[in-house]
Amino acid sequence: SNRNVLNVSCFKGAYVMKNLIQNCQNADVIGYWLASDLFSDYYDTKEILYGGCGLLTKDGIRKPSYYAFKFMNALGGQCIGKNENAVATRSGSKQISICCHNYKHFNFRYYLVEEDEIEVERQAGMFEDNERLQMTVRLKNVEEGTYQIKIYSVNQEFGNIQNEWEKIGYYNDLNLEEMEYLKSVTQPKIYLRQQKSVKGILEIETVLGAQEIQNIIVTEI
């Protein structure tokens, strides 16, 4: 449906990444319909976010689902590990890229209302749980040395246009400057740290909130 607020939420980002990880070794190319809400615009609403299923809003603001594709597009050509929540790849000999998610599926409450009647404020109660996921990625046979670990994260607080829209009171009549502000603040959080390998093993720990997606870039310094 193009009138479902979950299309704009972190849920959709985690859902997209989950499906891309499941199928990334089964297809050469994976497409998505559709790129922008411009192609599913409704004349009876002036809302900035009305639940369109595009990766971008009609004003060009990036949704969590957009970042799911962007993160996955940063993966290398050689898959070195994969499970239900993550995939790790190598690009050359110096860089490893990991994509991971903490997808949560619907509970019974989701099916009790029409898709176009779901309220933004009540999304959290429509999933099986909202528990965090502690994840450890163990990279073997790496060169001895120091590595830079860069984590891009999209969650309820960062890279989430719904959260930024809420901060301005769900206001719709925005001028150009205000719209550009929303575009600029809807960005993934970036974490940086350095870590040494031990006996050819590099262990990377991260925590993902419910419906959070991450792209972890590991580069030898």
Which residues are covered by each model-predicted region?
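C-terminal beta-sandwich/jelly-roll accessory domains of carbohydrate-active enzymes
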Residues: 100-221
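Aromatic/acidic polysaccharide-binding cleft in carbohydrate-active enzymes
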Residues: 1-119
